[in-house]
Amino acid sequence: MIQVLLVTICLAALPYQGSSIILESGNVNDYEIVYPRKVTALPKGAVQPKYEDAMQYELKVNGEPVVLYLEKNKQLFSKDYSETHYSPDGREITTYPLVEDHCYYHGRIENDADSTASISACNGLKGHFKLQGEMYLIEPLKLSNSEAHAVYKYENVEKEDEAPKMCGVTQNWKSYEPIKKASQLVVTAEHQKYNPFRFVELVLVVDKAMVTKNNDDLDKIKTRMYELANTVNEIYRYMYIHVALVGLEIWSNEDKITVKPEAGYTLNAFGEWRKTDLLTRKKHDNAQLLTAIDLDRVIGLAYVGSMCHPKRSTGIIQDYSPINLVVAVIMAHEMGHNLGIHHDSGYCSCGDYACIMRPEISPEPSTFFSNCSYFDCWDFIMNQNPECIVNEPLGTDIISPPVCGNELLEVGEECDCGTPENCQNECCDAATCKLKSGSQCGHGDCCEQCKFSKSGTECRASMSECDPAEHCTGQSSECPADVFHKNGQPCLDNYGYCYNGNCPIMYHQCYDLFGADVYEAEDSCFERNQKGNYYGYCRKENGNKIPCAPEDVKCGRLYCKDNSPGQNNPCKMFYSNEDEHKGMVLPGTKCADGKVCSNGHCVDVATAY
């Protein structure tokens, strides 16, 4: 049981009201100044943590007392959360900061069922809360030896540009399916019963323009990214989706792609970079690029219905506003497209509020998805089955004490289907998080009607010759761990060697780049990799293209022979300014008998792994 802590904010009886002030959010025309005083009610002798698990604030807004309940967002970071930036000479620097005792909270207002809150308590209180249908922002004032905070409505922040800001996605409901009436747009109890929370493992990427905009202050950028992720996590909880930040990458020395105002170009380049670079070194489900470049006529763009795709599970967001809430809503919107959600039409509603999936950003940013969005999202999940977001964090990976009713299976729990009011799992006792009498299991790929699946039932299909299928044991609800054949084991009749569950060979890589009737080129074509220029090199060091040694030429740029109709190109290669890595021979590819490519070298398979 989490000890609930009581914190009071003491204000003057008549809080100061100002007419205009410049804050981080911009020029604010009407605001209140409050002076928080923190009083913590802890048991005698208890050690106070730096950031409590739960807090309660009492404050006055517009002269009326309100009570703000806050709980630490313990699903914000994954246990393997990492941060990457680059030294001035281009060296990749990756760290794994401790994130257990962070300072990011979600909450609500007492006696206001529609209220929400997303607050950072790192240095004072900063964030937003919705009260009686209106959005308020709070932030500490930068005054020496003062705990003064400003509270103000979003509508009182001066907007630099009142022109509508659009999402770049042009698909609409007409490109999807016949429109269903709003009353039909529901997810059935059966869907929820067998499909509880999904888990999106998110990586945020910050471009060089944002680094420059923030005067190379990486700590400031990190704090902003944490606050954005906290709000996105809050928004998606109501869609039964947990968004966990698993990584942050800051292009501190230079952009890793060419970031252009043309949003389609930049999104394509970012997707290719994610596929060929980021995914090879960081496991995640979705990546979003934040840029300070002014995108042409749009503030965001994403692929639709693309979650889990190596290239297209991506979006780009312009750092359009200093207000974190605004940018977080744009991010939630673009990620919504990745989850199969289209722009709202006139049939769609989210009560009295504007909805997140409007084609243009609303005058007041909304934190609510419409009924159409809810249906769209779960229709995509149920029918397209994006498998990467199904994996639930292991109980030992969750950085928090176990809490029955949060829909996360934690240490000491046999099941967790949410609160008794919301539980749709016939196998689980929601009050105790224990299995009901006669039940062997309550979830898992090897659980059918509360019983373990029969031994030998396939629970994970083979993806290649190097990735055998997994089968249920008959003794557990969980599918056995995904295992691959040993790296270096011959595959495809000795045309290749296994590498991380795949059998990479040049023929398949040529096919992926150019289509049918394209094959591995003759050896003479690969000799061009000794040039050390854009169409021939083995690897890059400090931004320089390193020519291949004669014995390594088949581990540089890929050359293919095009025999397709109307083509006669014996040395065809692929090169793109937006992604120089695309078109290179993949790691683990056979480069000679008994040898594979590793970091631009052709090395003995016996010593490569």
Curated annotation (Swiss-Prot):
Q: Where is the signal peptide?
A: 1-20
Tell me its EC number(s), please: 3.4.24.-
Which cofactor does the UniProt annotation name? Zn(2+)
- Active-site positions, per UniProt? 334
What is one Pfam family matched by this protein?
ADAM_CR
Q: Which residues are glycosylated?
A: 371
Report keywords, A-Z.
Calcium, Disulfide bond, Glycoprotein, Hemorrhagic toxin, Hemostasis impairing toxin, Hydrolase, Metal-binding, Metalloprotease, Protease, Secreted, Signal, Toxin, Zinc, Zymogen
Per the database record, which ranges form the Disintegrin domain? 401-487
UniProt binding sites for Ca(2+) 2: 403, 406, 408, 410, 413, 416
**Gene Ontology CC entries for this record:** extracellular region; plasma membrane
Q: What is its main location?
A: secreted
Q: Where in the cell is it found?
A: Secreted
Q: Which residues bind Ca(2+) 3?
A: 467-468, 470, 482-483
Location of motif D/ECD-tripeptide in this chain is 465-467
Q: Which Gene Ontology terms describe the biological processes this protein takes part in?
A: proteolysis
Q: Where expressed (tissues)?
A: Expressed by the venom gland.
Question: Quick one: which residues bind Ca(2+) 1?
Answer: 201, 285, 388, 391
Which positions are listed as propeptide?
21-189
Q: Which residues bind Zn(2+)?
A: 333, 337, 343
Q: What class of enzyme is it?
A: hydrolase
Q: Share what the entry says about its subunit structure, partners included.
A: Monomer.
Q: What does this protein do?
A: This protein is a zinc metalloprotease from snake venom that possesses hemorrhagic activity.
Tell me which family the UniProt entry assigns to this protein.
Belongs to the venom metalloproteinase (M12B) family. P-III subfamily. P-IIIa sub-subfamily.
Q: Report the protein name in the record.
A: Zinc metalloproteinase-disintegrin-like
